[in-house]
Amino acid sequence: MKNLCGIDEAGRGPLAGPLVVAGVILLEDIVGLNDSKVLSEKKREKLFDEIKEKSKYHIVFSDAKLIDEKGISFCLKSSILEIIENLKEFSNSFLMDGNTNFGIQILQKEIKADAKYAQVSAASILAKVSRDRFMDEISPLYPKYDFHKHKGYGTKAHIEAIKEFGRSDIHRHTFKLKALGENEIGVQKSLF
């Protein structure tokens, strides 16, 4: 499937930072592609530049404010639609890792596609590295949170920082934490 466009995301579950979705059509074979989660940071960084050199690609960022306003599913779907719109002249076949196509007829879906298809692996790497670099770049602006260490994910240290300092403007305010006494509808439980 030479003209297949692989699509994957990074940042669906973190407490802070953007959702990043990438679409990739490989123009040349690239050795070493795999799901970004199983590759070392060094390997992802090396492959990132090679993927950009040897592909047609499009990357979409949805910030925390948009995620809070519209929801993660809306952001994911609108990002996929933007990718399809930007890459449709190069491909008529779009495949995403996962179990839903969000009602987008042209989009095929397959669980673990990021480990099975080079194009989806490449998209996984572009999304992950783009998001990680963004979190590293903004970390000095939010020194209390150490985003460069956990990239906004819900680590123990990150949750402790939220407990101490509250959420910043790049935190997802609609993502509630049981560790903070928040329930599923966002109301703090009574202390009495």
Swiss-Prot record:
Residue span(s) of domain RNase H type-2: 2-187
Main location: cytoplasm
Disulphide bridges, residue numbers: none
Location in or out of the cell: Cytoplasm
GO CC entries: cytoplasm; ribonuclease H2 complex
GO biological process: DNA replication, removal of RNA primer; mismatch repair
Cofactor note: Manganese or magnesium. Binds 1 divalent metal ion per monomer in the absence of substrate. May bind a second metal ion after substrate binding.
Catalytic activity, as annotated: Endonucleolytic cleavage to 5'-phosphomonoester
Cofactor: Mn(2+); Mg(2+)
Family that this chain belongs to: Belongs to the RNase HII family.
Entry function: Endonuclease that specifically degrades the RNA of RNA-DNA hybrids.
Name of the molecule in the record: Ribonuclease HII
Name of the encoding gene: rnhB
